[in-house]
Amino acid sequence: MRKLVLLRHGQSEWNKENRFTGWTDVDLSVDGVSEAAQAGRILKKNNYTFDAAYTSVLKRAIRTLQIVLYEMDLLWIPVYKSWKLNERHYGALQGLNKDETRDKYGEDQVHLWRRSVEVRPPALEKSDKRYPGNEKKYASLKEEELPVTENLEDTEKRVLQDWRELIAPNIKGGKNIIISAHGNTLRALVKYLDNIPSDGIANLNIPTGTPLVYELDENLEPITRYYLGMDGKIEDDKFPKKV
């Protein structure tokens, strides 16, 4: 049996302000720092250790991972950063308040933009200062790799490239792995691991700063999965069922 730990970053400043974040590189809030430290203490208390870690190139996920590894005395392990583990790109919605956006466009439309597997939010113009091509961290990417908007399917496609090429081979090789990433990045991976249909993933919410543990067989098929608290497993009966 192999264990994989998925961790959504601690609360960010824009989580706190209820704004669409996407690829905007905002930092953790004070509460988010505390959540990350608590996650590290939980993992240490439950005797977890890691051989390598994966994260995005966004500071809220990177900093969460650094805090967790500090709490576990594991700052020395290799950390791999990849833009393919970035949050889903929310296009022109990035920076907007979610409640104000609902008031303007309606609850149903915003729910589709947020939760639909196929529907993309309105796209950014490449002249927009929020376009990722303006950031040095993406200078090595081809123009066609830089999103102006994404749906969950787009996000899943890039996440699974890293999963198949980098992460899964390490797990099969016996490595203990933690992935510190984002709500939609992890929803996309959960959808794949648990073979959840598109209409079953819409209402899945992965909480910030709470370790999600997958126990996998030798073929990386899930045996079980659960959230982890100070006292051990936290079962979640609201988790979508695999088909």
From Swiss-Prot:
Disulfide bonds: none annotated. One of its GO terms (biological process) is gluconeogenesis. The keyword Isomerase applies. The active site is at 9 (tele-phosphohistidine intermediate), 87 (proton donor/acceptor). Substrate binds at residues 8-15, 21-22, 60, 87-90, 98, 114-115, 183-184. Its EC number is 5.4.2.11. GO terms for molecular function: phosphoglycerate mutase activity. Pathway: Carbohydrate degradation; glycolysis; pyruvate from D-glyceraldehyde 3-phosphate: step 3/5. It catalyses: (2R)-2-phosphoglycerate = (2R)-3-phosphoglycerate. It holds the Pfam family His_Phos_1. It comes from the Bacteria. Keywords: Gluconeogenesis, Glycolysis, Isomerase. The record marks 182 as: Transition state stabilizer. SUPFAM superfamilies: Phosphoglycerate mutase-like (SSF53254). It is an enzyme of class 5 (isomerase). InterPro entries: His_Pase_superF_clade-1 (IPR013078), His_PPase_superfam (IPR029033), PG/BPGM_mutase_AS (IPR001345), Phosphogly_mut1 (IPR005952). Belongs to the phosphoglycerate mutase family. BPG-dependent PGAM subfamily. Catalyzes the interconversion of 2-phosphoglycerate and 3-phosphoglycerate. HAMAP family: PGAM_GpmA. This is 2,3-bisphosphoglycerate-dependent phosphoglycerate mutase. It comes from Clostridium acetobutylicum (strain ATCC 824 / DSM 792 / JCM 1419 / IAM 19013 / LMG 5710 / NBRC 13948 / NRRL B-527 / VKM B-1787 / 2291 / W). The gene is gpmA.
